[in-house]
Each structure stands twice: as structure tokens, then as C-alpha cells.
Amino acid sequence: MKLQIQSVIYGNQVDALVKAMKALQQAVKVYHRRVGDLQVRLIYGDSTPTPVLDEKTQKDIREMLKAEIEFEYKVFGFNSGTAKGHNLMAENTDADIMMIMNPDVILEPTCLCKLMELLKLKEVGMVEARQTP
């Protein structure tokens, strides 16, 4: 199964993005251990006039995530806003499931297991995690 996780960023702090990525990476590891195979692609769409992630940082992130997550970084070159940014990232996806995630979200380690389990129910078409401060 293929999961595409996408986030629109605008002027975010790199350390906050990396913290969120590490939490996501842990959730993917837990999913692999408990459930099984899941191909995960994380896409950040950058609406900032000056890109948030330089080439070296992108390379470091890809290296950090490579065992569990394919990382893609798109610079829009304009302030796309959230909805258009997500539409641009979703245009050519081959994923079975898409997850929209705010860039500052720190996932609980079993979050993906719980969300994906609910999506297996035929009467469920969409799920959303509860956010707590």
C-alpha cells in the first residue's frame, strides 16, 4: 500500500520541520513492526518567497528518512495557499491513500496504525486524528 503525506510550508523553522519528520518516521517504524508493508512518500510544498530548505538540508533529510520514507520537496515559486498547494502536490500521485498534515504536527507513535485500521472499514472514506496541544 502507498501512502502520500503532504504538508504546505511557509517560512517554517527547519528544526521544527525536522522534529515533525522524526515523529512521522517513528510512526512509520511502528506501523512496519505491527502491521506490515507501507510505502510512504512525504512531500513538502513550499510557498515561501525564499525556499525554507536549502540543497544540503534536503539531502540531510533524505538521508535521515531514507529507510522508511521517500522525501520530496517542491518549491511553488508563489504563495499557493493551503488548498492550492495540496492540490498541486496531489496532482500526479499514485498513492492509495493521501494524508494531509500540518507541518508542525508531532504524531503519536501508533497514529498511523490507528488511522489506517479505520480506513479498512468499507463504510469509512476519511479519517482525522484528534489534535491536542
Mark where each language-model region is.
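Acidic donor-binding segment of Leloir-type glycosyltransferases
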Residues: 24-74
